Regions:
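Catalytic cores of nucleotide-sugar-dependent glycosyltransferases that transfer UDP/GDP/TDP-activated
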Residues: 1-205
């Protein structure tokens, strides 16, 4: 009961390598779902878009639990922004990101796309559901050389550094508005006891 459209999308990977195993772009499709009843009678309903990539999404049976999850979530964040940049039919006023997996989007929007005429006016809201999960690593045991301050440029999708990027910190750092699941949790995570080493940053924001 769905109407579907497909369009190709080239997502930059920021790869600096000439190695063919590290492509400069990943090709995705954007699938648009519109209920058939709404497509025919013109009623206003929620339209859903899905970013598709055979290697990083279609071949996987689960949402989480892969060694390259950081690449998969980075691709999603960058892919969403590339779709909005190249699609001339629709643009949101606000993008809502949730937890470390989409904190990269807030980062990209305020750095890579900060001067883009089409995207720079979009506001971002970052929702914290569980501050404990901050990336593909245990944030409590990070070597000094692997520490992510949230300000350095995002690495290439294929750089080993991508596995050490703190998506939670970057979402908090770059979002326009930060919110969480309850007023109580909002107060708790601004304390050393529950702040998971981000309480200082949260207080600053």
């Amino acid at each position: 009961n769905l109407h579907m459209e497909l369009e190709g999308l080239q997502v930059p990977t920021d790869s600096q390598s000439s190695n063919e195993t590290e492509p400069a772009y990943l090709t995705c499709n954007v699938r648009k779902y519109v209920p058939k009843s709404d497509a025919t009678n013109g009623s206003d309903s929620v339209i859903t878009y899905f970013l598709e990539n055979l290697e990083y999404y279609e071949k996987r049976s689960n949402i989480y639990g892969y060694n390259d999850d950081a690449v998969r979530w980075t691709l999603l964040s960058r892919g969403v922004l590339e779709f909005l940049r190249t699609s001339r039919n629709w643009l949101p006023d606000v993008i809502v990101s949730s937890d470390w997996q989409t904190g990269f989007l807030c980062n990209y929007l305020r750095t890579t796309y900060k001067d883009d005429e089409r995207l720079r006016r979009i506001a971002t809201v970052f929702i914290i559901h569980n501050l404990y999960y901050q990336g593909m690593f245990d944030h409590r045991f990070v070597a000094e050389m692997d520490y992510d301050d949230g300000q350095s440029p995002m690495p290439s999708f294929f750089s080993p550094r991508i596995l050490k990027i703190n998506g939670m910190r970057r979402g908090i750092t770059h979002a326009d508005v930060i919110t969480t699941v309850s007023p109580t949790y909002a107060q708790e995570i601004m304390t050393p006891e529950y702040g998971e080493l981000l309480d200082g940053l949260l207080k600053e924001r």
